[in-house]
Amino acid sequence: MSVMAGFAILITEAVVAFYKRVHAINFGVYGATMVGKTTLSYQLRTRGEVQQINKRTVGLERASRKVVKFDGDSHTLKSADIGGEAMYWKQWVEDMKSRKVKYIIFMIDHRHLDSTSNLDHQLAWKFLVDTITSNIWPNGKRKKEADYPMAVSIWANKYDIWGDKYPLREGQSIDKHDIYEPFKYGMRQLNDKGIPTFKYIVSAKSDPEMVYKGITTLIKDY
C-alpha cells in the first residue's frame, strides 16, 4: 500500500468517525410507567450504576444527545424521556412524528408474569403497534416511507430482578422466554408491515454493557 493510499484511508476513517459523532440517530424509547425508561436515559448519559429514581416523568421531555461506545464502535443517538401513563401515549406519537424516529425501544418488565391480570404492557404495546403500522397519522395525514422505523426492539428490563425468578426452561433460548409471549402478535403485525423486530434482555440500572451492546446491535444489524 502506498503512503498516499494509507493517508486516504486514514482521512476516510476520520471523516466517518466525525460523521457518527455529529450525526445523531433518533431513537424512540416507549413503555408503561415505571418500566425503566428514565433509568435507561440516565444510563446512556453516565455509563455506570444508576441510583434509584423515584420521580415519575411527566409528559414529553426535550430530546438529548447521548454517545454510545461499545466494542471499538461509537454512535451518537438522540432520545427523549416520556411518561408511560396512558395520558401521555399521544406524546409518544408526537415524538415519533416530529423527530422521524429510526429505531424504537419498547421497554417491559416482569409485572405481567407476576400477575396475569396486569395488562400495562399489553395495552401500551397494542397502542404502539397500531400507531406504527397505520398508514396515516392521527391527524389524518398520510405517512411517508421515512415515517416508519427501521426496527422495533422489545427490551425486557430488570433482568437482574426477574432472571432467577423466571428462569429459562431447559433448552429454551432467551428470545423464547415467556416474558415475550404477549407481544408475539404485535411483532408479527410489524413484520408483515416490513418492519423487523428484535428481542433483548437488559438490566438498565446496573449493567451498562448490556445497554450499550443492545443499542449498537440495533444500529449495526438493522
Where are these regions (language model features)?
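Short, flexible boundary segments at extreme N-termini or domain junctions of P-loop NTPases and their
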Residues: M1-V29, T216
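Glycine-rich phosphate-binding P-loop
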Residues: N26-E49
